Amino acid sequence: MLKPELSNQFKRDYNILTRRGYDITRLDAVIIILLKQLPLEPRHRDHPLKGKWHGYRGCHIADDWVLVYKIDGDRLKLMLSRTGTHVDVYGQ
């Protein structure tokens, strides 16, 4: 099982989503799946990212709610970088 490593930005994003009334249990469920190194369901649309986020992966918690993460297999860490809407995370 991987150990989570949360960026400061991820912590801020998490708090913002909580204040906005998002169902955080949906995010927590995806994080648990990733920590156990199990495959995500196709509805999460897990995919590698490009550009500024090259080397990271993105998945959908809901239609306009994404999680940006990276797995460091050498250190057995799940690095949680960002979460929020597409605009929050990617500025688009």
Model region roles, listed by residue range:
Residues 2-3, 7-8, 43:
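Basic nucleic-acid-binding interfaces
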Residues 33-60:
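A short, surface-exposed loop/turn module that caps and links secondary-structure elements
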